[in-house]
A protein has these predicted regions:
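Bacterial N-terminal signal peptides that target proteins for export
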Residues: 1-12
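Disulfide-bonded cysteine motifs in exported proteins
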Residues: 4, 32-35
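His/Cys-centered metal/cofactor-coordination and adjacent catalytic loops
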Residues: 22, 47-60
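The canonical Cys-X-X-Cys-His
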Residues: 34-43, 97
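Detector for the c-type heme attachment site
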Residues: 41-46, 62
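Extracytoplasmic electron-transfer domains, predominantly the class I c-type cytochrome c fold
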Residues: 56-105
Length: 105
């Protein structure tokens, strides 16, 4: 009886452990993009950007090597148009966002 309880308990533990795992860098990067970029940019592989002049994030690798964006993100992104806020990301945010952008290539 005790063995059955322990066996079922261990099986249950193994089943719920993935759900409790910490988010991956890609997941955190997507969450960052959703919170900070999606108002204007398409952040997935297929949709159009809500703001027509804002390039979809999935096309950034066509313009720049993704790794080359690291310095720009660290120094702060600023643009010539007033609608886009200036961004300066910390190293963890940069890693997460670049990890997510690589999934869109």
């Amino acid at each position: 009886m005790l063995q059955n309880v322990l066996r079922h308990g261990l099986i249950g533990l193994f089943l719920i452990t993935p759900a409790l795992a910490a988010p991956t860098a890609e997941q955190r990067g997507k969450a960052f993009a959703r919170a900070n970029c999606a108002r204007c940019h398409a952040i997935d592989r297929g949709s159009n950007s809500p703001l027509r002049i804002a390039p979809p994030l999935r096309t950034l690798h066509n313009r720049y090597p993704i790794e080359a964006l690291e310095e720009a993100l660290a120094e702060g992104i600023s643009t010539g148009h007033p609608g886009m806020p200036a961004f300066e990301l910390d190293p963890d945010q940069i890693h997460d966002l670049l990890s997510y952008l690589k999934t869109l290539e």
